[in-house]
Amino acid sequence: MKKYILILFLFPLLVFSQKTISKEEKEVKKFQKELNEEYLNSKETPLRGDNFTNFKEHPFFPFDLKYRVTANFVKTENSEPFEIPTSSGKTKQYKEYGKASFQLDGKPYTLTLYQSLDLLKQEKYKDYLFLPFRDATNEKETYGGGKYMDLKIPKGNTIILDFNQSYQPYCAYNAYDYNCPIVPEENKLPVEIRAGVMYNDIYHH
């Protein structure tokens, strides 16, 4: 009888705890699931050989709402195309689309958002924005070359930057088959962004 009463008592607590997962955290879990599935798919993964065979899932920082910020967005008018150097020594053409300014722990930061001229040729990427950045976790818990975020053109003057959905470039896992844009100097943050994908440097040995 006592065991039955205990179950009745705990059940609503379990139900309540399941309901407390926020919409934002669900979005991050979806991102993590899709990223793992991509790397497990032999047709999509950048991994090769034993790295692919041994891959199970990415390590992630714990979800932290602190790293989901609403930034003020200012579009860059009449920006000219320019070349961003890549990890292979080649270059890729981009143009600056705008600036995103936000606060983290009470301090202001600004990051530049870009558009890939190659991707602009494809209809499905017309509203795609590219945000490469570096932070103080690089070469420790994250890839030394920095991380990326995929965003969409905002409709107003604000944009959500969810660093929980930041990921490492393909070059972090396969430096031979990919050439990845190097993070511009203006997008190097002097603070730790403990969010998104972590990195185990087992891929370049």
What residue ranges belong to the model's regions?
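Bacterial Sec-dependent N-terminal signal peptides
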Residues: 1-23
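Start-of-domain marker
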Residues: 19-80
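Extended, aromatic/histidine-rich regions of cofactor-dependent oxidoreductases associated
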Residues: 21-25, 167-205
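Terminal leader/tail segments of proteins
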Residues: 67, 79-86, 98, 186, ...
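A mature extracytoplasmic/lumenal domain signature
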Residues: 73, 113-117, 135-137, 163-167, ...
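Mid-length scaffold segments of soluble, non-membrane domains
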Residues: 80-144
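Short, surface-exposed linear segments at secondary-structure transitions and domain or protein termini
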Residues: 118-126, 151-159, 201
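Acidic, glycine-rich flexible loop segments
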Residues: 132-168
